[in-house]
Amino acid sequence: MRVQICAVGRLKAAPEKHLLDDYISRLDATGRGIGISALPVCEVEEKRRLQGSELMEREAELLLAAIPKGALIIALDERGRIETSEAFAKRIGTLRDSGAADLAFLIGGANGLAPALRERASHVMAFGAMTWPHMLVRVMLAEQLYRAVTILSGHPYHRA
Ligand SMILES: C[S@@+](CC[C@H](N)C(=O)[O-])C[C@H]1O[C@@H](n2cnc3c(N)ncnc32)[C@H](O)[C@@H]1O
């Protein structure tokens, strides 16, 4: 199963980018042995000056166009479900075992994800009830994906 993070906005050369690249490459290196690989992070951006719901709907279109066709979608949203790292790892392992080819994680921009996109997702996950900057959410998600593959492969990175 291939996993991909797809986000609104461009991450310039910054400490967050360094961390993100590091976790994605660790995720790919550890995940391949257990049937999970990482696609490059994809970023989308609307250049026109749209506002509010019009902007969110356009960003939703761009996100859906950027992910692999037929990918299962997990949306990142503070109104989503909070779970432990072990439960998240189990969720990823179950999807892999079910034969899912591609799994896309979608992160919104400053306005958040369009409600229709959240409804389309097979799961909506939250890193707590607080709102985090989308640049940090990418890094947090990449780390949790790396942690998940270490849990699934019995690697000692995660200590419960
Ligand atoms: C700055 S936030 C947007 C907040 C926006 N006001 C909203 O209501 O969704 C940008 C993106 O980061 C992600 N995000 C922020 N906080 C999060 C959290 N606690 N859990 C999961 N994702 C989060 C979501 O994908 C969100 O669309």
UniProtKB/Swiss-Prot annotation:
Identify the residues that bind S-adenosyl-L-methionine: 76, 108, 127-132
Similarity comment: Belongs to the RNA methyltransferase RlmH family.
Q: What is its EC number?
A: 2.1.1.177
What reaction does this catalyse?
Answer: pseudouridine(1915) in 23S rRNA + S-adenosyl-L-methionine = N(3)-methylpseudouridine(1915) in 23S rRNA + S-adenosyl-L-homocysteine + H(+)
The beginning of the lineage is: Bacteria, Pseudomonadati, Pseudomonadota, Alphaproteobacteria, Hyphomicrobiales
Question: Which Gene Ontology terms of cellular component type are present?
Answer: cytoplasm
User: Which EC class does it fall in?
Assistant: transferase
Q: Which residues form the signal peptide?
A: none
Organism field: Parvibaculum lavamentivorans (strain DS-1 / DSM 13023 / NCIMB 13966)
Q: Where in the cell is the protein located?
A: Cytoplasm
How this chain assembles, per its entry, is: Homodimer.
Q: What does this protein do?
A: Specifically methylates the pseudouridine at position 1915 (m3Psi1915) in 23S rRNA.
At the top level, the lineage of the source is: Bacteria
Mind listing the GO molecular function terms for this protein?
A: rRNA (pseudouridine-N3-)-methyltransferase activity
Query: Which SUPFAM superfamilies is this protein grouped with?
Result: alpha/beta knot (SSF75217)
Q: Which InterPro entries match?
A: Alpha/beta_knot_MTases, RlmH-like, tRNA_m1G_MTases_N
What's the protein name? Ribosomal RNA large subunit methyltransferase H
